[in-house]
């Protein structure tokens, strides 16, 4: 079976992949055989920093992390749209500028509305204020 030019171009990638996998395997085996396998009581506590822990490691967090994730997704999509608009500016012209301006304006109005509603207040005082309102 003849070797094509595309297969020849993939040979360096295959060599690099084999080298990387081999190096990872060697390092994992070295860590397994050279490291001490002693089980100590300190390895089973939540903080393995050499200090005796005080308090509970499993405390409830006050920051609503789901909001951070939603904000990240919204502004990440906004960045993708703006990047796509910027790369095709020559084709879109003024109508594209109007569309992206409206898009950013709607997002900013949504951010202002969220701010005014208290959606960005995450501290303990905000949690107490929400508890009093309900």
UniProtKB/Swiss-Prot annotation:
Topology in the lipid bilayer: Multi-pass membrane protein
Positions of transmembrane segments: 10-30, 65-85, 94-114
Keywords, alphabetical: Cell inner membrane, Cell membrane, Membrane, NAD, Quinone, Translocase, Transmembrane, Transmembrane helix, Transport, Ubiquinone
EC top class named in words: translocase
Reactions accelerated catalytically: a quinone + NADH + 5 H(+)(in) = a quinol + NAD(+) + 4 H(+)(out)
GO MF annotations, alphabetized: NADH dehydrogenase (ubiquinone) activity; NADH:ubiquinone reductase (non-electrogenic) activity; quinone binding
EC number per UniProt: 7.1.1.-
Subcellular location: Cell inner membrane
GO-annotated cellular components: NADH dehydrogenase complex; plasma membrane
Record-linked Pfam families: Oxidored_q4
Principal cellular location given in the protein's record: membrane
Domain of life: Bacteria
Protein family per UniProt: Belongs to the complex I subunit 3 family.
Function: NDH-1 shuttles electrons from NADH, via FMN and iron-sulfur (Fe-S) centers, to quinones in the respiratory chain. The immediate electron acceptor for the enzyme in this species is believed to be ubiquinone. Couples the redox reaction to proton translocation (for every two electrons transferred, four hydrogen ions are translocated across the cytoplasmic membrane), and thus conserves the redox energy in a proton gradient.
Subunit-level organization: NDH-1 is composed of 14 different subunits. Subunits NuoA, H, J, K, L, M, N constitute the membrane sector of the complex.
Stated name of the protein: NADH-quinone oxidoreductase subunit A 1
